[in-house]
Amino acid sequence: MTHQTHAYHMVNPSPWPLTGALSALLMTSGLIMWFHFNSTALLTLGLTTNMLTMYQWWRDVIRESTFQGHHTPAVQKGLRYGMILFIISEVLFFTGFFWAFYHSSLAPTPELGGCWPPTGIHPLNPLEVPLLNTSVLLASGVSITWAHHSLMEGNRYHMLQALFITIALGVYFTLLQASEYYEAPFTISDGVYGSTFFVATGFHGLHVIIGSTFLIVCFFRQLKFHFTSSHHFGFEAAAWYWHFVDVVWLFLYMSIYWWGS
């Protein structure tokens, strides 16, 4: 290893951005094949290569940060800026979905019956499963904060306990959302109501699955003593992401489930 006189991490050439891009192409193409031709072969290949890429890329980052010491305070500062910008881009991503929803619902056209929800649509009761989902995500926000404070205080047992509770609540939310989709009296093809409902809540559900995966990785890393009270940005980024998912759900609940019903 050559000596360096600066605090920045000079990353070695890596195949993972290329394999990640190829797996994303396979997944999106596979999704189209599944929708139009009922074939899941390409989608399965894309998901498999994506999972392998994520595993090996994260493995390399963990090696560089935890075992090789490349994540100096200057590098961590850059990672924090990167995570903040990523979350801002996600906020703008969801802004598009809310824009589509309010554009359609605030001034419903004659084709929709001049009312919202459109004629013939029976919306879900916001005081049933959606309210339970809201309480589950809010509880998970409390438990992830508990985990963060426990880590800052050096209490490993409480950190693992709180993190496990957060993951369990995230999985429970996903199962509730899946059951709600299964029992919904409308589909994604039921006009603009169905499309805005399923795209907005579906992408949020995808983000919950991504966040849960992020937290599961943190849980296993903490089992191996990877985090300390002063060096734990991987967990901190996961906590920021989880709080973002919480806040988006509150807006979804108030807009689509409560006001939109």
UniProtKB/Swiss-Prot annotation:
Keyword terms: Membrane, Mitochondrion, Mitochondrion inner membrane, Translocase, Transmembrane, Transmembrane helix
Annotated PROSITE patterns: COX3
Example GO biological process: mitochondrial electron transport, cytochrome c to oxygen
GO CC, any one term: mitochondrial inner membrane
Species annotation: Ovis aries
Family that this chain belongs to: Belongs to the cytochrome c oxidase subunit 3 family.
UniProt function note: Component of the cytochrome c oxidase, the last enzyme in the mitochondrial electron transport chain which drives oxidative phosphorylation. The respiratory chain contains 3 multisubunit complexes succinate dehydrogenase (complex II, CII), ubiquinol-cytochrome c oxidoreductase (cytochrome b-c1 complex, complex III, CIII) and cytochrome c oxidase (complex IV, CIV), that cooperate to transfer electrons derived from NADH and succinate to molecular oxygen, creating an electrochemical gradient over the inner membrane that drives transmembrane transport and the ATP synthase.
Membrane topology: Multi-pass membrane protein
Mitochondrial intermembrane side: 35-40, 106-128, 184-190, 257-261
GO molecular function list: cytochrome-c oxidase activity
Stretches assigned to the Mitochondrial matrix side: 1-15, 67-72, 153-155, 224-232
Positions of transmembrane segments: 16-34, 41-66, 73-105, 129-152, 156-183, 191-223, 233-256
Name used for this protein in its record: Cytochrome c oxidase subunit 3
Coiled coil: none
Enzyme Commission numbers on file: 7.1.1.9
Subunit structure: Component of the cytochrome c oxidase (complex IV, CIV), a multisubunit enzyme composed of 14 subunits. The complex is composed of a catalytic core of 3 subunits MT-CO1, MT-CO2 and MT-CO3, encoded in the mitochondrial DNA, and 11 supernumerary subunits COX4I, COX5A, COX5B, COX6A, COX6B, COX6C, COX7A, COX7B, COX7C, COX8 and NDUFA4, which are encoded in the nuclear genome.
Chief localisation class: mitochondrion
Localisation: Mitochondrion inner membrane
Reaction(s) this enzyme catalyzes, per UniProt: 4 Fe(II)-[cytochrome c] + O2 + 8 H(+)(in) = 4 Fe(III)-[cytochrome c] + 2 H2O + 4 H(+)(out)
